[in-house]
């Protein structure tokens, strides 16, 4: 299947990366290489681009799409939480910019057998990296009712979390829930008809929650930002695109922590932590897509871009 993904906030990202022709730049979520190609085009033969992705299909597609720039490009098949370790493996110890687009690519959503979409029936999977064994099937069929309630509430921000979890546990007592279609049916039964009439698809929030849990999406964000900052040259920038409030809050807080000086409790008269500010925040408020972009690519509607610069 053709790996198709419309890059979100493309011009805004490239502009905010402040790309130097001979710099070293990392795309943590290469996907279809839309952002990546624009970065690579701005590099000279002395520059270097490193693209990360945990989806082997994305790596294959990116290699094709960036083949004309082969001499200045390297690929890493890994989760971006390993950014520091993986870069060290290829002899890269300092970088000049990092980009991460935290959305699920439209390719993954559209490829039915990956199990990301609530619009198509498929095995319950949702693994970004198919080398991992843990899948959506395990979450849906082995988590306790309390555990399901917690992730649907925390990661999906769904008001019906408790009821959805209860219905899932009751349904799987008869037989395992094996497909996305079966899960959607359970969710629809759990949410009262009146509540289903308004708002997004009733399964949207639960699917988001399970996907985040399967791929530990929130757990890896802060580590990646901290590690990227630790190897960033002065003036280098970290650009992160998020798609829901949980991710955005994590990025905002990670930037805030890196930008702050002393973090000692207020009652201490003298600083004990010796923490110094590592970055300055470029975007006090996130950059949002234009109305024109939303019209062309409705999936960009919830995107937010935050930027920090190493000092």
Swiss-Prot record:
Role description: Specifically methylates the N4 position of cytidine in position 1402 (C1402) of 16S rRNA.
Classification via PANTHER family: 12S RRNA N4-METHYLCYTIDINE METHYLTRANSFERASE (PTHR11265:SF0), S-ADENOSYL-METHYLTRANSFERASE MRAW (PTHR11265)
SUPFAM superfamilies xref list: Putative methyltransferase TM0872, insert domain, S-adenosyl-L-methionine-dependent methyltransferases
Gene name of this polypeptide: rsmH
Catalytic activity: cytidine(1402) in 16S rRNA + S-adenosyl-L-methionine = N(4)-methylcytidine(1402) in 16S rRNA + S-adenosyl-L-homocysteine + H(+)
UniProt KW Transferase keyword: yes
UniProt cross-references to Gene3D superfamilies, sorted A to Z: Putative methyltransferase TM0872, insert domain (1.10.150.170), Vaccinia Virus protein VP39 (3.40.50.150)
Record: residues binding S-adenosyl-L-methionine: 33-35, 53, 80, 101, 108
Record-level GO cellular component terms: cytoplasm
GO terms (BP aspect): rRNA base methylation
NCBIfam families cross-referenced by the UniProt entry: 16S rRNA (cytosine(1402)-N(4))-methyltransferase RsmH
Protein family per UniProt: Belongs to the methyltransferase superfamily. RsmH family.
Molecular functions (GO terms): rRNA (cytosine-N4-)-methyltransferase activity
Domain of life: Bacteria
Keywords assigned: Cytoplasm, Methyltransferase, rRNA processing, S-adenosyl-L-methionine, Transferase
Pfam families: Methyltransf_5
Entry keyword annotation includes Nucleus: no
Official protein name in the record: Ribosomal RNA small subunit methyltransferase H
Location(s), subcellular: Cytoplasm
Enzyme Commission code: 2.1.1.199
Organism of this sequence: Clostridioides difficile (strain 630) (Peptoclostridium difficile)
